[in-house]
Amino acid sequence: MYKAININRALSLLIAVLFSNFGFAQQNPGDTQTKTPAISPQALRDLFKPYMKVLEHDQEMLKKSRESIELGRVLFYDRRLSLKSEVSCNDCHDLAKHGTNGDHYTGLLKQKKTKRDVPSIYNKGGLKLFNWDGSHTTLKSKTASAIASEHEMNMADTDLLIQRLKGIAGYQPLFAKAFPKDKDPIRMETLVEALVSFEEVLITPAPIDRFMAGNDKALSAEQLEGGLLFDRKFCATCHTGTMFGGQMLQKLGAVRSWPNQKDLGYYYTTKVPEHKMIFRVSSLRNVEKTAPYFHDASSRHLWDAVRKIAWHELGQFVSVKEALSIQEFLKALTGDIPKELIKKP
């Protein structure tokens, strides 16, 4: 199931870098007064076009699924979905904090209630794999699993959950509006469907999308340079697709062993020895805002995470200057939080 790095593609990209100027802007010797980007906007756009589509809100979906989305929003904030009514989806995936919550994760870690960092809930609809170990292939199965997991909502007794919701008067009209053709609308299946409807519209269009749509000024000269370096260092080999990741599984520490071997990732799902240290490649959307980084939260700073993954995954030494340049590009993947959509009930 997991895909390894495509070495042939990487070599082809390297050859292209060495023998093509990619539309580099020419600069006169000694001219240091004006910042000239190392690559033209159109040249960088052409690099990303083969695998990236512009991310934008689907107004038709928002209108068509309005009642289901509204129900999902209410459920997302409701702590009564958890066994002891202590935690909601939003407590871990804080929508006001780009869909994650480092403080909450730290608290759970101290209590030994979790061993993995909390990934962002935003832009999940465009992923092919879910969970750090890629153990789910649909958002629906991931959402249902989160409710039952002892490390998340801990509500494995779905009968108890449905009985609880049916006893809450406010939910009866919400479920009836969202599922008007269902004679028994308050069911586990409809609950999950409503949550997924809400989660699927949690997207954050960013400057990179305006850039890919043709706005040359959406990215700064520094971000253009960082984008070129992102490609030159083969980051896009794994962090590919519109979400810049979330499409494949990969061995963490493919070239140099990952320092923390306590969590073996996908191996726990398959029990296949070759799957030890296999993890899902993370989406880089909003990565600037979602520290700490990696499943083990081993990097607090984005530039450090860039250097670390390059060293262990590709065997490449990336200087601090280069890492900061890539970090500047990654800021262009930070989108706007849909404030109206995520208002608390």
Protein language model annotation of sequence segments:
Residues 2-69, 127, 150, 154-224, ...:
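Post-cleavage N-terminal segment of exported redox proteins
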Residues 28-145, 208-307, 314-317, 341-345:
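Short glycine/threonine-rich turn/loop motifs
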Residues 88, 117, 187-194, 234, ...:
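Residue-level detector of well-ordered alpha-helical segments, enriched
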Residues 280, 290, 320-323, 330-334:
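C-terminal substrate/ligand-recognition segments
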